[in-house]
């Protein structure tokens, strides 16, 4: 749907605004950063969940990823993006109840790459192949997920049992069912870093752990096409010798399309790089207690508190900040409304903030915030609505 020349002040609130030129520029900069190091970007779709922004992530031929391979967080996303992208990685170790749908998607595109970090994942995929011999037309395409220190998912690369999984599918009894693509790690613990220097050191550590394991597998005779690392913080502070020293040839950031207050606080972006805002309406003002009330609560902003480890919570705890007046912060979100206070308790200029007027909020965590909405209003540099994007929803 095209909404040319519409003013954002006419929109019902709360709603999401996507800053088109900012998002495009974020995509280009990440691709250029990776290309300068000689590595691919396999972008994650989970933040924006839209075909349009997925295309932005491959614009201007800056991305060395010629297969236009992407990552999704759900099979619903996989089906949604399969209309445009044919090399998809499903980023969660596969549960048995997802196997059938995953294989049907695999058959419909060039390949659906599936994660495993446990022999039970392999068994469930083999079991499906054995029970459905007429449907099993091509091997499963798989990545081994390894743990580089986040401790959420992934096999321990130091254990022999991890390498035994690779042997099982490459040379062992499961060989006829699998095509091994490579290894994948995710440094989600980068969001707990204190400084950009800490993130740079963690990026080196993830590259070392993942790269060394890739080299080990190759030394044992295994073909490892892809060694993939990343999170948006790490991919914003990549070591210059990523490929030459560590053998890492792919990164997989996701949040960088939008960024958010967390990324800003961590030093991964500037405020002007944040490509998504929540538009809200001031529903009441309280000069006597120096507060505003807006119609964007937890169901519009999420309740993610962000980088609390970087804040003096007695002074600056917040669930988002006000665009163009970052001294104002969202506090105490309830379901449909939130209070706004000033960071240092300085007097709010109520002449600027009237009941019924609109404000734009920079969210703590854009992935969760964007997921709250069924459409995005795309705006240009003049704050005019130029398009509407509809994201994939649910599972």
Swiss-Prot record:
Modified residues (N6-(pyridoxal phosphate)lysine): 46
Superkingdom in the source lineage: Eukaryota
Catalytic activity, reaction form: D-serine = pyruvate + NH4(+)
Binding site for Zn(2+): 365, 367
GO biological process: cellular detoxification; D-serine catabolic process
InterPro entries recorded: Ala_racemase_N, D-amino_acid_metab_enzyme, D-ser_dehydrat-like_dom, D-ser_dehydrat-like_sf, PLP-binding_barrel
Keyword Lyase: yes
Keywords (A to Z) from UniProt: Detoxification, Lyase, Metal-binding, Pyridoxal phosphate, Zinc
Cofactor section: pyridoxal 5'-phosphate; Zn(2+)
Binding site for pyridoxal 5'-phosphate: 184, 191, 232, 254-255
Mutant phenotype after disruption: Knockout leads to a loss of D-serine degradation activity and an accumulation of D-serine within the organism. Delays development with a prolonged period spent at the mound stage and decreased spore formation. Decreases expression of acaA and carA-1 during starvation.
Keyword Ribonucleoprotein: no
Role noted for this protein: Catalyzes the conversion of D-serine to pyruvate and ammonia. Plays a role in D-serine detoxification.
Protein name stated in the entry: D-serine dehydratase
Organism: Dictyostelium discoideum
């Amino acid at each position: 749907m095209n909404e040319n020349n519409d003013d954002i002040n006419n929109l019902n609130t709360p709603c999401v605004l996507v800053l088109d030129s900012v998002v495009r520029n974020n995509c280009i900069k990440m691709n250029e950063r990776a290309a300068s190091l000689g590595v691919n970007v396999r972008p994650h779709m989970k933040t924006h969940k839209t075909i349009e922004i997925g295309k932005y992530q491959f614009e201007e031929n800056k991305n060395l990823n010629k297969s236009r391979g992407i990552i999704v967080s759900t099979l619903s996303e996989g089906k949604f993006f399969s209309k445009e992208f044919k090399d998809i990685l499903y980023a969660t170790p596969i549960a048995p109840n997802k196997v059938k749908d995953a294989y049907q998607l695999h058959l419909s595109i060039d390949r659906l790459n599936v994660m495993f970090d446990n022999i039970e994942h392999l068994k469930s995929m083999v079991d499906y192949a054995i029970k459905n011999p007429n449907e099993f037309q091509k091997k499963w395409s798989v990545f081994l997920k390894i743990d580089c220190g986040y401790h959420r998912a992934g096999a321990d690369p130091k254990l022999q049992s991890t390498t035994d999984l690779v042997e099982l599918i490459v040379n062992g009894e499961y060989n006829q069912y699998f095509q091994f693509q490579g290894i994948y790690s995710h440094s989600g613990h980068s969001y707990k870093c204190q400084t950009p220097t800490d993130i740079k050191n963690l990026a080196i550590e993830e590259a070392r752990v993942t790269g060394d394991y890739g080299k080990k597998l190759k030394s044992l005779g295994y073909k490892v096409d892809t060694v993939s690392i990343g999170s948006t913080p790490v991919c914003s502070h990549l070591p210059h010798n990523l490929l030459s020293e560590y053998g890492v040839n792919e990164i997989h950031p996701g949040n960088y399309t939008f960024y958010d207050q967390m990324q800003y606080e961590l030093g991964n972006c500037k405020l002007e790089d944040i490509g998504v805002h929540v538009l809200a309406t001031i529903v009441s003002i309280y000069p006597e207690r120096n507060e505003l009330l807006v119609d964007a609560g937890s169901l519009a902003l999420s309740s993610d508190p962000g980088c609390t480890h970087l804040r003096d919570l007695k002074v600056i705890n917040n669930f988002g900040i006000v665009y163009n007046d970052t001294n104002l912060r969202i506090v105490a979100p309830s379901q449909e409304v939130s209070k706004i206070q000033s960071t240092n308790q300085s007097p709010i200029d109520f002449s600027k903030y009237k009941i019924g007027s609109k404000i734009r909020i920079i969210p703590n965590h854009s992935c969760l915030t964007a997921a709250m909405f069924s459409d995005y209003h795309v705006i240009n540099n003049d704050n005019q609505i130029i398009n509407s994007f509809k994201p994939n929803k649910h599972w």
